[in-house]
Structure formats: C-alpha cells, structure tokens
C-alpha cells in the first residue's frame, strides 16, 4: 500500500507538472525564486480560467454536444457538416471548414467552442451567490471538457492563458462579445453551456442584480490587442462579418430621469421576457438567451457594431471632468467600493476607455473598406452621442461649468435612454445603415479630445490622478466632489496610453513618496490608511444646526425622539435606528401626518442637509472604508500591485519605443524592480507571512498574507514574466527583445530544462553556464549570452535554420502558435538589456 501511495503521488506530481507545462509554467534560470513563483502563478491561472489540456485538438463528440446544446435546430441543419468531420482534428481546421460553409450561424457556434478543462468557478463557496463547483471528470471517469466562472474573473485569466496558445484568442473575443447585451454590458456568469444572470430574490438580503463596468472595457481590449499583435488583419475581416450576437439579459435599465432621481435603484427585472427566454432555451438550447430577430432566429451583427455598443454604453454615462457614472447597481474591480454605486463616477473606467478608443481609432483608420453596415438603432445612438461631443467641443477651451456638465450628461443619457427604450420594447427591427469608416474615425478622435481633457482635469495637486469622484445633480447642473487618492487610479492612468514616459515616471515618483506606499511590506496600499471616527464621536448634531431648524427645536422641546434625541449632557443625535437619509425623510413624513406638517414642509430639505453633513454618507465608499482586511483599510491587495507592476513595465516599453533619454529609462527600470521586489517571492516567510513563492490575495495591516492562490494577481505576473524574458509578438512575428532582462538570470552552472511537448510527453534539454531556458507555446527556448543576436531553429524532421537578428518571420511564428510540432526547439544568442 505504501508503494501504491508513493506511486500515486509521483503520478499526480507528474500530471500537475504537465498541466503547468502545457501553459508554459516551467522555467530554469539562476533566479530560482522567480522561476518557482512563475510555476505557481501559471498553476493558479489555469485553475481559474481553465486549460486547453489537449491544446488545439477538437473531439468531434464534444463539439457536437456543444453545438447541439446551444442550438439544436442549427445542429440538425448542419448534420452533414459534422458527419464529415474526423473523430479528432485541429482547431484551425474546424474554423477553416466552418468558414467555407458560408453558414454564419454555424461559424458563430464553432468560433465559440473552447475545449477547456481544469477550470473552477472563482469565489468563496460560503458566498450565497457563488454556486461553487469543480468538475473535471464525467460520471464514467473520463475527462470532462468544461469551464465556468464569473465573467469578470474568467476572462482575465484567459488573457494570460492565450499567450501560450494564441490561436484561440479570436474565439475568446467571440465568447466575450456574444455575451454582451445591446445596452452594452455583460451578465454575471459564463460557462461552456452559455451565459447566466442573477435573478431577484426578495427573501435573500444578499441577492441583487446589476452590471460591472471597468473590467469589461479593459479585458475585451486586451484580447483585441493580442489579436492585432499575433494575427494582424484577422479582426478587420470580422468588422463587416455578421458573426456576432447580443445577450438577451432581462434587465431593464431605467430612464435617465429615474437614474438621476435614485441612482441606487436603476434596474428592473423583466419577468415576462425572462419567461420567454426560458421557453426559447427549452425549444432550441442556450441560443435562446440571445436576442432574436423578427424571424425567430438569432439576431447577428458584425464586430464593428459589437465594439461600438460596448463603448457607447460607457460614453452615454460620461460626465465631463468626472468620469463614467456608476449607475448599474454594481461596483468596479474593487468590490469593497460598493457604496460608490449610484453617486460614484469612475475615472478608472475612463482611463481604460481612453486606451480602448485609441485602439478603435487605429483599427478603423487601417481598414480597407469605406463603410460598414450597422443596426439602425445603434447608428442613431452613435450619431446622438457624437453630435453631443461635436456641439460642445468649445467647452474644451477651459474648465467646464456645472451647468454645461449637466447639459452634456443630459444629452448623452437621454440618447441612451431612447435607444434602450426601443430595444427593450421592440428589439431590433432588422434594418441596417451604412456608416462611413471616416465618420467612425472622427467619432473616436472627438471623444478622445473630451476624454483627454477630463484626464488632465483629474491630475491632483500632488501629481497623482483621481480614481473615483462623486456627482451631485442639482437644478443648476452636476457638481463634482473629489475623493482621496487610490492605487487603482494610478494603475489605470499609467495603462491609459495618455501619459508620456516622462509623465508616467513622474506619477511613479510621487506614488513612491505618497501615503499609498507602506514600508512594512515595501509595497502599496489600495488607499491611504486612516483612523476611523470612534463610535462615541458619531451621530453628533452641532447645536448651531439644531438652532437653524424650527422643526428640530420643536421636537426637542416636545420630547419627541422620532427624529432627534437629546442626551443628559445637552448634546443632540439623530434617531439611532436610522441607516440613511431616507430613514430621516420617512420619519419626517410621519411627523407631518401627526401635527408637524407646516414645520416639515418648511425644514424637510434643511434637516436632510444637516443629516448628510453629520454622516457624510455620500463620501462613504463601502467596505473599503470600514473594514481592515481584504480590500479594506491598511490592506495591500496583491492583484492591484501586480497591475502596477505591468503598468510600470508598459511605461518602460513605451519609453523604448519613443527613444526616451537614458535617465528616464533608468529610473523607469528602477521603479519596475522596486515594485517587483515588494511582491512575496522576494521576501522571507517571516516578512511575507506565508510561502513566499505562492501568490496570495491580500495582506492586512495587522497580519501576514491571506487567501492563497486564487487571485487575479497571477494573470498580470504571468504576462510580465514573459515580457521580462523578452518575448514579444510584433505584426505576427515572434521577437526576442529582453530589454528588461537582468544578466543575473543566466545560469552560473549547468542545469536541465524539463518540459512537456505538445503530445504531453516529458522531455529534457541540458543547459550550460551562461544560459537559461523556458518554453513558449510549449517549444523550449534557450538563451545564451553572446555579443551578436541570432536565432537557431531546430525542426522536428531534423532540419535547422539560422536567423540573423532577433525576429522569427510570421509563417514560422504561426507554426509556433499553432502547436503542430513543426519546430522542436529555439536557441537564441543575445545580450540582456540590464546587468
């Protein structure tokens, strides 16, 4: 038995290494901690996002099960297509064969097929909204190809995954945009079997419905950028191809006036539509959760329309000089900022929208067609939003007033209101309008002018940038209140593309000296730590405010404590059962019905103002301002630190591209490695409070690292590590440019790179002094120190090819991406960028 246990442990360890190796998690350098940390990051990344265990191999039976589960009608129509397939074949052959059928519905379904396994839903199983499941085997013990997750978690892990198997990236884009709604949002959950959303549960205080925002823009954009890098030109053919669709989530965002009146309660649930969707799912499959046309088929549109729908939903909530209004009942990346929902305005989303719009500008500027057909309803929304920007361009000459800010928001918001009302009531009529690509370019340019103006307006006096602001709608317009600094804002602005390398350096300099930096972990807090008001110092009404209100004075004199109470020391407090200003307003209505009608009519607004001045609820951000772990006060959230790491690396790379001076480049490199040195794998267990090479969620101010493994941190670090090693893809060509690789990573003695080839077989490659090894798309890559840069490709058939320089051409690069085993190893002679 003991030997059986030992054998099983060895087999399990081998299989685990194979899983990590399939996603390029095996590296050998002199920096053992970095290599081990990368192994852990890759492991946890695939545990969240899943893994293509058999790479591009498609199992015919599983594909049929998938297509039939989505649309039984379409499967039956295309039965001959599936009958003609081999039992197992390459994914690229599936996409090519589906394209040749000229059947858009079949193409769409095949593009959405992702044979992932080893994925589990992210989230604490104790949370009632996480129906937790780990499914890796079928009932008969065979491998189950399945994935499921909250969309904002699973898509970020797919970004890092796709770097090791990049020919799936367009399918990931398809999965993403086909899960977005006509009004521009994504439902909560996504699985292999389709999308899912939360429903109202009146008896469950934890249940709620709504949409997240900032993730959507930046996660989709990262896939688009990857596609452009790895497969230049591929997305352009999708821009005019009707291969995409809209999710039909039965959420109904209320009208603009209702949003202004109560921005906390903005979404109704359409029970009737939900029932109809259920009937459609029963009839055809998961496609029943998509918007249908007037012929009871899935309504399909091109990628241009889908990309526009996403950004128009953001710009319709744009408040000049403030950001994107958070009015869909959900926070953003930081769940702990939950109280910002309603009156919060996100500069974080605007920073990412800036990068997104710049990408669209470049994309539309490069297309070969002059016009593209878009749904009539969306064109009307596009024209309304564009004309709002054009008509108000003169406002960019100076600071925008509250009045003009309110007028602009009103035009943008009402345009979206009109669009949504039509879609909710009648769906799409099915008519298209030809839109000139020149007009799309102009729209991107004009919107970018307003975005850049707002970014400049949100540079703080200390040189940092605002992350979130607060809006107050009044009869005179929209007022802005600025909140305290947050790490999230600095990361987003560094990633926005708006700053020059020199400006990015200035932000990093100030950040290191700010209250966001904590020396105890040589890292960064989400927000400055602070002392909270003690309980005995809360709910104290200044005597001068009581004297301002005849109603409050009358109640004190009458001994009526339903609104205000006085204590034995002569102090005043609001009723202790109140939880917000609405509680106070409700109490005043009761008083009006009981003899205080005149005084309530006179002082209702004043008392509400006093209440808000006492509690300042508007500036309460949520759990982030009232707890001490997770994303709370004094807490380091390692995912945001890794986002900062990657943003600093992007700033360094931009400096290279723009030929920034040596001093700037040196200081940017210093910042990168300073941020890197604060991450756990560079620390002792005593300092980190956990195994240093393992990723952890957060470190509270009073303890060591908490919540191991299942953190979004791993995604950014996987990406950053590959860039540290210098692997880049430019116009479809693999390039080795180790601009930030340190010479100390090269081996001081001999070693062995153990890896797994595309067939899953364990292989080894000897390494000598002055070398290092890793895999890329499961092809072993060996770096050797040399003065002249060159590449030696070894092929599976025994051939070899020498390349002068640091770039592999696009055809050979595609052979690497496609994992067909053509290239068996890559030897690169080079000099690292740093000593």
Predicted segments, located by residue:
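Acidic, mature catalytic/reactive cores of soluble proteins
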Residues: 1-835
């Amino acid at each position: 038995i003991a030997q059986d246990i030992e054998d099983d442990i060895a087999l399990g360890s081998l299989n685990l290494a194979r899983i990590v190796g399939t996603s390029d998690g095996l590296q050998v350098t002199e920096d053992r901690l970095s290599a081990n940390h990368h192994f852990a990051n890759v492991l946890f990344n695939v545990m969240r996002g899943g893994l293509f265990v058999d790479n591009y191999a498609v199992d015919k039976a599983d594909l049929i099960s998938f297509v039939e589960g989505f649309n039984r009608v379409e499967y039956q129509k295309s039965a001959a297509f599936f009958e003609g397939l081999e039992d197992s074949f390459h994914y690229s052959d599936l996409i090519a064969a589906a394209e040749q059928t000229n059947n858009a519905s079949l193409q769409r379904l095949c593009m959405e097929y992702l044979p992932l396994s080893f994925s589990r839903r992210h989230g604490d199983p104790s949370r009632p909204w996480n129906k937790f499941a780990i499914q890796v085997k079928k009932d008969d013990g065979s491998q189950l190809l399945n994935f499921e997750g909250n969309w904002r978690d699973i898509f970020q892990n797919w970004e890092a995954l796709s770097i090791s198997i990049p020919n799936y990236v367009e399918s990931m884009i398809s999965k993403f945009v086909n899960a977005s709604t006509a009004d521009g949002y994504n439902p909560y959950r996504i699985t292999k079997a389709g999308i899912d959303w939360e429903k109202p549960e009146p008896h469950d205080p934890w249940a709620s419905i709504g949409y997240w925002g900032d993730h959507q823009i930046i996660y989709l954009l990262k896939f688009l950028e990857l596609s452009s890098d790895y497969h230049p030109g591929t997305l352009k053919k999708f821009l005019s191809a009707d291969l995409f669709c809209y999710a039909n989530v039965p959420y109904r965002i209320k009208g603009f006036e209702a949003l202004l009146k109560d921005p906390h309660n903005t979404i109704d649930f359409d029970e009737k539509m939900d029932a109809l969707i259920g009937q459609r799912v029963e009839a055809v499959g998961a496609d029943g959760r998509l918007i249908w046309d007037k012929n009871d088929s899935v309504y399909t549109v091109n990628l241009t329309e889908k990309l526009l729908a996403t950004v128009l939903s953001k710009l319709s909530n744009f408040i000049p000089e403030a950001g994107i209004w958070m009015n869909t009942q959900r926070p953003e990346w930081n769940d702990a900022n939950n109280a910002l929902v309603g009156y919060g305005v996100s500069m974080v989303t605007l920073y990412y929208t800036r990068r997104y719009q710049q990408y669209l500008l470049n994309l539309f500027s490069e297309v070969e067609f002059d016009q593209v057909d878009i749904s009539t309803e969306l064109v009307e929304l596009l024209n309304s939003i564009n004309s709002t920007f054009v008509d108000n361009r003169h406002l960019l000459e100076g600071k925008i007033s509250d009045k003009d800010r309110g007028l602009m928001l009103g035009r943008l918001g009402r345009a979206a209101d009109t669009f949504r009302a039509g879609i909710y009531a009648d769906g799409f009529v099915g008519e298209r309008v030809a839109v000139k690509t020149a007009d799309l370019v102009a729209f991107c340019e004009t919107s970018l002018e307003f975005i850049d103006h707002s970014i400049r307006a949100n540079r703080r006096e200390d040189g940092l940038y605002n992350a979130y602001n607060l809006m107050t709608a009044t009869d005179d317009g929209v007022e802005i209140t600025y909140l305290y600094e947050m790490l999230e804002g600095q990361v987003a602005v560094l990633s926005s593309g708006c700053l020059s390398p020199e400006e990015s350096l200035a932000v990093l300099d100030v950040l290191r000296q700010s209250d966001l930096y904590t020396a105890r972990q040589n890292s960064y807090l989400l927000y400055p730590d602070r002392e909270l008001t003690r309980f005995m110092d809360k709910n104290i009404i200044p005597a001068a405010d009581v004297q301002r209100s005849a109603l409050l004075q009358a109640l004190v004199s009458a001994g009526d404590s339903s609104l205000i109470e006085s204590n034995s020391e002569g102090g005043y407090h609001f009723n202790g059962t109140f939880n917000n200003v609405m509680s106070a307003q409700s109490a005043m209505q009761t008083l009006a019905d009981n003899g205080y009608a005149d005084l309530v009519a006179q002082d209702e607004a004043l008392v509400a103002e006093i209440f808000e001045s006492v509690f300042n609820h508007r500036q309460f951000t949520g759990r982030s301002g009232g707890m001490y772990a997770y994303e709370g006060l004094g807490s380091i959230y390692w995912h945001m630190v890794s986002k900062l790491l990657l943003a600093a690396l992007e700033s360094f790379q931009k400096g290279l591209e723009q030929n920034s001076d040596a001093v700037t480049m040196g200081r940017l490199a210093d910042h990168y490695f300073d941020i890197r040195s604060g991450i756990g794998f560079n620390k002792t267990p005593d300092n980190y409070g956990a195994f240093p090479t393992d990723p952890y969620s957060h470190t509270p101010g009073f303890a060591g690292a908490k919540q191991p493994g299942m953190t979004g941190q791993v995604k950014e670090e996987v990406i950053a590590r590959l860039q540290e090693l210098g692997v880049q893809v430019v116009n479809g060509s693999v390039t080795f440019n180790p601009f930030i690789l340190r010479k100390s990573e090269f081996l001081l003695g001999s070693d062995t790179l153990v890896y797994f080839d595309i067939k899953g077989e364990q292989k080894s490659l000897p390494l000598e002094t002055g070398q290092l090894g890793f895999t890329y798309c499961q092809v072993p890559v060996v770096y050797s120190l040399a003065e002249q840069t060159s590449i030696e490709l070894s092929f599976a058939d025994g051939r070899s090819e020498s390349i002068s320089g640091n770039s592999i051409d696009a055809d050979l690069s595609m052979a690497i991406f496609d994992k067909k085993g053509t290239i068996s190893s890559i030897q690169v002679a080079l000099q690292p960028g740093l000593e």
